[in-house]
């Protein structure tokens, strides 16, 4: 349901009071989230949703894994993949969408969801 409020022509009153779990709440008061939301609004004129925060996190998670894995321009694609897999299955990552995120060998991420409610046509942290 995250993103439903931005569907063109959607009557947001239909979702009023809807509760959902999401990895990201744009109105969370921590400094990291507020800095991201502010920069996103300035760049795109809209409030970011879960998918924007996920994209932001994945760039920095890959960067962290690449640095820790010693990835460089002399490596071939197979070596890069092996290094990334090794790092992702052994590291933790603190991002906008979760603290202490981990990944298993299949690539599935483990992170705690946040509860939000749709109130007055916007997502609100619970």
Where are these regions (language model features)?
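Extracytosolic ligand-binding ectodomains
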Residues: 1-126
């Amino acid at each position: 349901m995250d993103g439903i409020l931005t569907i063109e022509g959607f009557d947001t009153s239909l979702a009023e009071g809807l509760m959902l779990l999401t990895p990201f709440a744009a109105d969370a008061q921590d400094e990291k989230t507020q800095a991201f939301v502010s920069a996103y609004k300035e760049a795109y004129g809209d409030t970011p949703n879960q998918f924007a925060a996920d994209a932001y996190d994945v760039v920095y998670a890959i960067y962290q894994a690449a640095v820790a894995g010693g990835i460089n321009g002399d490596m071939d694609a197979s070596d890069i993949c092996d290094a990334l897999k090794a790092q992702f299955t052994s590291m933790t990552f603190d991002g906008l969408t979760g603290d202490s995120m981990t990944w298993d060998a299949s690539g599935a991420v483990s992170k705690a969801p946040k509860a939000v409610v749709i109130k007055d046509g916007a997502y609100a942290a619970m």
